[in-house]
């Protein structure tokens, strides 16, 4: 079975006003990591597990598996997939949570992630391929970070400096055109775009 991963590229940044990890980000990091390793060591059949708790568009509607737009956020297709998403969550989420407060941050995170899941299930209607990963929510965080700290520098791959606003625009454009041209990708670009759109509306 082919899985669609919603993963983010590696990014580094500096200049945050508070380097401590707030409770919301910490909770999400712990939950995602614990669930990943529980699934890995459980010995369960991955195809069966992902088809029930990943986001399978056709099952959300035909089988009324309405929990999938939530549970897919906590599943990842491998350690690197998990590492990238959790790194971006930690790097960009902590400043947003310090700025907004934990409750508002978590509401936004889940609004983007769940909204992206619902959008993916609509636009991917008829698909039996499970979508897994937190990147719908993570892309929403990147948008919010770009709007909140537009001129802050980040380092792509730890080397190339770029202002956050240009990075976010670039990622959005890439995801959009990739969704238009890619028909056999393991990355769910629709989920990335939807996370940003929900974040913008929110």
Where do the model's predicted regions map?
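A detector for small-residue-rich transmembrane helices and their helix-helix packing motifs
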Residues: 1-202
């Amino acid at each position: 079975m082919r899985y669609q991963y919603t993963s983010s590229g590696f990014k580094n940044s500096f200049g945050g006003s508070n380097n401590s990890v707030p409770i919301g980000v910490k909770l999400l990091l712990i939950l995602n990591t614990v669930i990943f390793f529980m699934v890995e060591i459980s010995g369960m059949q991955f195809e069966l597990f992902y088809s029930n708790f990943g986001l399978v568009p056709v099952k959300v509607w035909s089988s009324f598996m309405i929990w999938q737009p939530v549970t897919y956020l906590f599943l990842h297709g491998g350690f690197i997939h998990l590492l990238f998403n959790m790194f971006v969550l930690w790097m960009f989420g902590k400043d947003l949570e310090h700025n907004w407060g934990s409750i508002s941050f978590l509401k936004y995170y889940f609004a983007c992630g769940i909204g992206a899941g619902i959008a993916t299930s609509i636009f991917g209607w008829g698909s039996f391929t499970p979508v897994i990963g937190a990147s719908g929510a993570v892309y929403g965080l990147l948008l919010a970070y770009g709007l909140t700290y537009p001129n802050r520098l980040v380092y792509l791959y730890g080397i190339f400096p770029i202002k956050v606003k240009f990075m976010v625009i670039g990622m959005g454009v890439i995801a959009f055109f990739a969704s238009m041209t890619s028909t056999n990708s393991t990355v769910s670009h629709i989920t990335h775009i939807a996370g940003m759109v929900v974040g913008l509306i929110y």
